[in-house]
């Protein structure tokens, strides 16, 4: 007689108590993800109302950087406070940041609200994934992970709609306030259905504060320099960020508490993987920060339409990931190399078509939309295979660290990329001279810069493919 584990279906995930638990977990990710697209959609309207174009990219950079810190706090928060209290703390922080954004009279207050939002949102995001193993049987884990991850696809539909409608009505603040009742319902559900205790021993592990502080400082260095249009100050910010990242690598190699698996700084083992992941991730998540603004100013689109057009890259990323999941192992090298090529082609197309502007007719927008889709789809095609290789190449004792590092690297490159995008846009004239001419010049330089980033992704992907054909070193 053979033992076998029954395959759990979607019906099992939504049966009885599992249904309300599932809704609670997806609620945390949905709130975080929808908020991302709401903010991106309404940001052009926000700066038109309260000013702060110089700090445009800071809204994303600070939000994502705070999300990294929030997600890093979750393991200790779960073990010491328990799931129920952890969710309550995360929801209260997120709500405080959301209300601050909705009441912000100026950009500095808005940025403070976005940082608070990011801290709470990062907690909710990490809690949702961490809770899966606690509240569900192992047979349900793949379904639960798929459901939670799918909320990003839902967010690409819901976020731009909420942000766009309120922006067009001239009440952008209500876009943030509209999240308040949802946060309240989510909190009540969490307090009702989640366990008080996590079932695991209290964690006494120290957080990797030196590395987290250096990551944050690197993003802030670039962001601070980007405020000025002076080349010297911007170059100084970039140089300081590079120095901080080199220091981070030194600290990480010697630290007893690491944030990356062993071998992460070896090109032959994990280094090329992380570089490719970082370059590709930044090319999508950072460039799309300015896309709604470009569509509104240069192509005569409403906030609602601009928000949806900006979400094309994210939606195509999801479709690409789904479509490539069944690709045979022998063909993944070609897929990994294809993604950066698609990125370069798409970015060059955007650099040519977006700056001149148009009246916004469908035939003007169609090639731009195709370019956006090509970029996102290419990253999506290669994403599952990059993650799979990271898990395979990481040492056995580093498997949990490898899983967590993917999210951290993606978030960090998004934050750093947004800061760099803000620097390039400001230097290219987004704020001075501003207007149509300044925005067009910023778009040209921004997409040209991200084309270079995609080209660098090809270089690292080529190194990755070549290293896969050679014996792997144990660590570095």
Region annotations inferred by a language model:
Residues 12-21, 206-208:
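N-terminal membrane topogenic signal
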Residues 73-206:
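Helix-loop-helix hairpins in multi-pass membrane proteins, especially solute transporters
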Residues 36, 40-44, 96-102, 153-168, ...:
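Membrane-embedded alpha-helical segments in integral membrane proteins
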Residues 1-15:
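Short, Lys/Arg-rich, polar N-terminal cytosolic tail immediately upstream
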Residues 18-35, 39-41, 51-62, 66-75, ...:
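12-transmembrane solute porter fold
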Residues 143, 469-476:
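Short, charged juxtamembrane terminal tails flanking transmembrane helices
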Residues 168-276, 283:
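Hydrophobic transmembrane-helix bundles of small-molecule transporters
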Residues 23-26, 92, 210-219, 341:
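Alpha-helical transmembrane segments
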